[in-house]
């Protein structure tokens, strides 16, 4: 997966942040 779409990147970052807070 080498997508360079801003939307996809923003979604991935948002998902990682959500998982980070959920892990806490």
UniProtKB/Swiss-Prot annotation:
Keyword Ribonucleoprotein: no
A single GO BP: pyrroloquinoline quinone biosynthetic process
Recorded coiled-coil stretches: none
Region forming the signal peptide: none
Positions bearing the Pyrroloquinoline quinone (Glu-Tyr) cross-link: 16-20
Disulfide bonds: none
Pathway: Cofactor biosynthesis; pyrroloquinoline quinone biosynthesis
Keyword Phosphoprotein attached: no
Keywords of the record: PQQ biosynthesis
Any Pfam family matching the protein: PqqA
Role summary: Required for coenzyme pyrroloquinoline quinone (PQQ) biosynthesis. PQQ is probably formed by cross-linking a specific glutamate to a specific tyrosine residue and excising these residues from the peptide.
Family: Belongs to the PqqA family.
Record-given protein name: Coenzyme PQQ synthesis protein A
Native source organism of the sequence: Acinetobacter calcoaceticus
Origin organism lineage: Bacteria, Pseudomonadati, Pseudomonadota, Gammaproteobacteria, Moraxellales
Gene name tied to this protein: pqqA
